[in-house]
Amino acid sequence: MNVIEGVVATPNARVAIAIARFNNFINDSLLDGAIDALKRIGQVSDDNITVVWVPGAYELPLVANVLAKTNRYDAVIALGTVIRGGTAHFEYVAGEASSGLSSVAMNSDIPVAFGVLTTESIEQAIERAGTKAGNKGAEAALTALEMINVIKAIKG
């Protein structure tokens, strides 16, 4: 039986982080967590990390697609926060961000890690950005690194 598993230590990985400015008081913590995980656990150097700011979560798939098509990155990490409000806007933005990022991953053959919080409240978002529920930015970074290695192992 063959078993393929990825590791997170990936010193030569080239990683792009696409991050939404909207709700940046939360997203800044996601970014800090992602960069810390890339550098401390993944051993990725500053020179191999590119951060691209976009207006909001809805814009993440387009930028992730452009980044993936450059062939300069081994993975893209998408970070953002969508908080439910009193209108259907939440469903549209969260749904399009999720399906768009998934589509980029499927069509580009590079990992696109989903670090977009979709929460019911600001409190839930804060918890997932580094307090009670860990840091989802760091988790997305580790997912990206592991997937880089899984795909490399599959391709041989």
Curated annotation (Swiss-Prot):
Gene3D superfamilies, per database record: Lumazine/riboflavin synthase (3.40.50.960)
Catalytic class of the enzyme: transferase
Gene Ontology molecular function: any one: 6,7-dimethyl-8-ribityllumazine synthase activity
SUPFAM superfamilies in the cross-refs: Lumazine synthase
Catalytic reaction annotation: (2S)-2-hydroxy-3-oxobutyl phosphate + 5-amino-6-(D-ribitylamino)uracil = 6,7-dimethyl-8-(1-D-ribityl)lumazine + phosphate + 2 H2O + H(+)
Enzyme Commission no: 2.5.1.78
The protein's name: 6,7-dimethyl-8-ribityllumazine synthase
